[in-house]
Amino acid sequence: MNSMKGKRVIITGPTSGVGKEIALQLAALGADVILGCRDTQKGEEIAAEIISRTSSSKPVVMQLDTSSQKSIRDFAREFRRKHRTLDVLINNAGGNRGTLPKVTSVDGIELTFATNVLGYFLLTQELLDVLKKRASARIINVASAYASDLDLDDLQFERRRFESFRAYAQSKACDRMLTWALARRLAGSSVTANAMTPGLITETALYRHAD
């Protein structure tokens, strides 16, 4: 694989599953990894594991709750204060509430949609200027094979009975659509946007809450 030495990468949701493996692999390739974590204590534990397993420089842990618009803006503001450029943004943080009832975010939005869709969108918008300063930058949105049809008239489950997996599946369909729209918007620029479907990884909260 190509070296990532000198490349600055933000990964959201890096404390388990897909995000953790991405962080490990990119650190091993020499990338300067920034871990956007809701739980910074877990983030520090992952950073220590990355160092021990890859002999890379210490990843930077920053607090980020992608269900909160304020947290996203604070994260982006702090990043821009410290760094002028960004090479790769990996929007991976996501959630599925399993058998738990519907919950809204601090902004009053159904939590799955707030985290998995609006979180991707807002963080990308907040960091687009620093991505565009690189000659070849990447936005990668982690999607899912479980993406399903949308009910555009009831994305917030205000009329339908809330089903956590349906909420997750429609959020991942939105992520695909978001990526397509973003790719068209960025055509001809130095930034490309792609969605990826990683397959099933069982060591995640999403898998544990699947019953």
Predicted region positions:
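Active-site Tyr-X3-Lys motif and surrounding loop/helix of classical short-chain dehydrogenase/reductase
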Residues: 60, 70, 74-81, 99-114
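A short, exposed helix-loop element centered on a Lys and neighboring polar residues
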Residues: 124-125, 180
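Rossmann-fold cofactor-recognition segment
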Residues: 52-70
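N-terminal Rossmann-fold cofactor-binding loop
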Residues: 36-40, 44, 66
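Catalytic loop of short-chain dehydrogenase/reductase
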Residues: 95-102, 109-113, 132-191, 197-211
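Conserved hydrophobic beta-strands of the Rossmann-like cofactor-binding core
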Residues: 8-11, 89-90, 139
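Canonical Rossmann dinucleotide-binding motif of NAD(H)/NADP(H)-dependent dehydrogenases/reductases
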Residues: 2-37
